[in-house]
Amino acid sequence: SAASDVYKRQEESRSCINIWDEVNHVQTEFLEPGFTVSEEEFKGFEKHFTELVKKADVVAMSGSVPKGLDGTAYQRLVRICKEAGKKVILDTSGKLLEMGIEAKPTMIKPNIDEIRMLTGKSCDNFQDMVDAAKQIHADGVEIVAVSLGGDGSFVVCDDGIFRARVPKIDAVNTVGCGDSMIAG
């Protein structure tokens, strides 16, 4: 079973609402901005997180971080996990991903655009994508699971390169697909 522990704050957590218009086949997202976290508050969270990590086997971190935090937020949390000898999965994007992989998470789940950003490679074909993922793996990320959207995914790890193809379906909504992938 998965344990949970809440780090309480005065502010309410944000809501993210996704609406699917079945008539026009249009998706609309409402993403509340959320609260701002100061460096001092984040240090308090890091202290709490350090204790929590001791109880975990694997830690998954995904998405964005609150306003007020810079690109090092996940990097710092990944380091805490690694220092505790825990496996850590990082599923984020942009500067958070770029800085986060410097701490060598156990696994990342980038998409093609993120692989391009991390390696500077064009990734115009499958072999280029694999080579880019191999570069990240060689730099210390144990498992690089690359999402290819409707074309499935592939994984680069010490045991080799593995490709997963998915059946063609009419996707109604892709919200949560990446989260589901790292959960599996």
PLM features: residue spans?
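Short, small-residue-biased leader/transition segments that mark boundaries at the very start
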Residues: 2-7
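Short beta-strand segments
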Residues: 8-9, 18-20, 31, 61-62, ...
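Gly/Ser-rich phosphate-binding catalytic loop and adjacent alpha/beta segment
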Residues: 8-15, 38
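Short glycine-rich anion-binding loops that position phosphate/pyrophosphate groups of nucleotides
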Residues: 12, 33-35, 64-67, 114, ...
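Conserved phosphate-binding/catalytic loop of the ribokinase/pfkB sugar-kinase fold
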Residues: 19-54
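A short, aliphatic-rich alpha-helical micro-motif
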Residues: 53, 101-102, 138
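Conserved beta-alpha-beta core of the PfkB/ribokinase-like small-molecule kinase fold
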Residues: 58-129
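Conserved phosphate-binding/catalytic region of the ribokinase-like
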Residues: 79-83, 98, 126-184
